[in-house]
């Protein structure tokens, strides 16, 4: 059984070659190319030659007038050739670096510069041999499937034939690509070509698909002057008349790109100036200076503007704290009702600003200096000249004397015997003669106690009982002294009543008064009467923040101080 193939019509049909070239170009660029090829592979020439292939029938499965299916053994050694064009990378170091990770390469500079060279490749002298399954149908076209790799050899001629390394490399790469082409792409190409030849519907469908592509790429473009803007202006911003717009055309010498809408120009200007948003309609934020708006000189001005409002706030804060300090130091205004509230105001003043600490220290030094200025040498006339009334007035009017005894106690010179128990917090040691004047403020309490004892009818011999005590030169504390003074304090509390409790701070000054035998008794009684009158007036007034809370504590226990050296 024999078949006659008419090979010459395939060679003479120009449309067949054009279509075959397009299909081969798409097939060669479909698969991933090697890194050395940096451009598309284009089939520029295709010729099947004048020698047909040899076919040997091995099996016929179906045979009819319009269909055929069989298995053939094909062998081809003809004069067909194929010409390709592409661009390759001539610098192998660049190709090597592109295929390697950056951290594993030395990253050269000039040595890795890419160098692309155009390349033309001609494939000829094909030798094919293999088993082919051929299925023919007028409705479905021709289907050719290779059961094995049909390519045995071919000849590759290129621009780099003079370089053996490049020639051998191209030979290997092209053979590998052609083997994939024969096994996968060539059957699909043959099937599409057969459908175009024998199936009119498929040909009409392809023509419809290719027609929009041609019309889209050809023909005149749209005229932008067909629908001019509503408010046209030129490049200088001058408005244009309708007659001027009508005279414009794409072929005229007038610059058509100068015809812009004023609204669009404003929007573009706003977008260029803002540099903060991609939307033209984003609302701006009030009292905000954007970084893109300011130059280095303007940034300094902006910083000055932003920091200026802070200065008045700081000055007002200082003024407020200063007024609070003066309010606390005033002798005519009572600041609070308890010592704890006064302490709270004092520490809140420290927390408000840094200057409050300095103000309080300055005031404390001034008060100490006033007391020192009132001190006189210890004589009869000088002792009488020290006005207990003025000292008491300062104590009653200044609420900040609550913390005054503590620094004075800390300034005590080296004691002979330290306190023996934690209860010593309520006891104050005897103060030497050079320090007694600094605590002249509690002295009126001593006279007040004496006056109260006189008014309630207490024994007049009580002060002489305390005169022998300072004669004791022994500095060690004694239990008999503590028991004696405790009994004396109980008698005083019974005589004066529960509302006349006196702290332990008056005991040393009681001893001081008993030891001062040269003081005029008449002057002391007159001063004591005046102070008692002031005490009665003080009871009618609201209690101060420090004095009332301190003298009115019912749970305050009084203990005699330890016997220190004179």
From Swiss-Prot:
Gene Ontology molecular function: any one: lipid binding
One Gene Ontology term from the biological process aspect of the record: mitochondrion-endoplasmic reticulum membrane tethering
Annotated localization: Mitochondrion outer membrane
Annotated membrane topology: Multi-pass membrane protein
Major place of residence: mitochondrion
GO cellular component, one term: ERMES complex
Biased composition (Polar residues): 380-401
Region Disordered, residue ranges: 212-237, 349-401, 432-518, 539-566
Keywords from the named record: Lipid transport, Lipid-binding, Membrane, Mitochondrion, Mitochondrion outer membrane, Transmembrane, Transmembrane beta strand, Transport
Coiled-coil regions listed: none
Comp. bias regions, Basic residues: 358-370
InterPro entries documented for this protein: Mdm34, SMP_LBD
Residues annotated as domain SMP-LTD: 1-195
Bias kind Basic and acidic residues: ranges: 444-454
Family classification: Belongs to the MDM34 family.
Domain notes: Lacks alpha-helical transmembrane segments, suggesting that it resides in the membrane via beta-sheet conformations similar to those predicted for other outer membrane proteins and porin.
Function summary: Component of the ERMES/MDM complex, which serves as a molecular tether to connect the endoplasmic reticulum (ER) and mitochondria. Components of this complex are involved in the control of mitochondrial shape and protein biogenesis, and function in nonvesicular lipid trafficking between the ER and mitochondria. Mdm34 is required for the interaction of the ER-resident membrane protein mmm1 and the outer mitochondrial membrane-resident beta-barrel protein mdm10.
Complex formation: Component of the ER-mitochondria encounter structure (ERMES) or MDM complex, composed of mmm1, mdm10, mdm12 and mdm34.
UniProt xrefs under PANTHER family: MITOCHONDRIAL DISTRIBUTION AND MORPHOLOGY PROTEIN 34
Protein name: Mitochondrial distribution and morphology protein 34
The species this protein was found in: Aspergillus oryzae (strain ATCC 42149 / RIB 40)
Lineage, broadest ranks: Eukaryota, Fungi, Dikarya, Ascomycota, Pezizomycotina
Gene it is expressed from: mdm34
